[in-house]
Design a protein with these regions (language model features):
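Short, intrinsically disordered, mixed-charge
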Residues: 47, 95-98, 138-142
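Charged, low-complexity, helix/coiled-coil-prone segments
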Residues: 28-42, 71-85, 139
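Phosphoinositide-binding peripheral membrane targeting modules
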Residues: 51-62, 66-107
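Canonical pleckstrin homology
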Residues: 99-127
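Anionic N-terminal interaction surfaces
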Residues: 7, 11-63, 119, 127-132, ...
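C-terminal output/interaction extensions
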Residues: 133-137
Length: 142
């Protein structure tokens, strides 16, 4: 799941038709499952020296953790050929929280607080290990 308490502004868009960007205000849940499909989809967006740490997919959307940022992918339209890629740089993270899976609750959660953006929350299915992602976020905080 992804949710944030603020609204992104659309710069340079036509007033009668705003682009369909990721809705960080939507409180709806979607569960992310580890999947390399989105790692391939964002390769052309990666900077020199930037590498994929892990990639996750929900029903249509995806999230990719790289060495420099989080890239959220919003698949749009009936055919899914149109996509919005939102870059969330680690350098803007002020705090984060990880909830690991338990004995009966197999899901885990990652809440990240971005300066001037608010909270972004990701929910993962199964026994997803957040160790590498957590370590990488911590490296950018300290």
């Amino acid at each position: 799941m992804v949710d944030v308490a603020s609204v992104r502004q659309h710069v340079g868009t036509k007033p009668h038709r705003a682009p369909q960007m990721i809705d960080f205000d939507n409180k709806g849940f979607f569960k992310l499952k580890q999947n390399d499909e989105y790692a391939e989809r964002v390769k052309s967006l990666l900077l020199d020296g930037e590498q994929v740490i892990d990639a996750y997919k929900s029903m249509r959307d995806g999230v990719v953790f790289t060495t420099k940022r989080i890239i959220a992918v919003n698949v749009q339209g009936i055919t899914g050929s149109k996509k919005d890629f939102t870059s969330l740089p680690y350098k803007n993270i002020v705090a984060y929280s990880v909830e690991t899976s338990g004995t009966f609750d197999l899901d885990s959660e990652l809440e990240i607080y971005f300066s001037s953006l608010g909270k972004v929350r990701f929910e993962f299915t199964g026994r997803t290990s957040m160790v590498e992602v957590s370590k990488h976020i911590s490296r950018h905080l300290f």
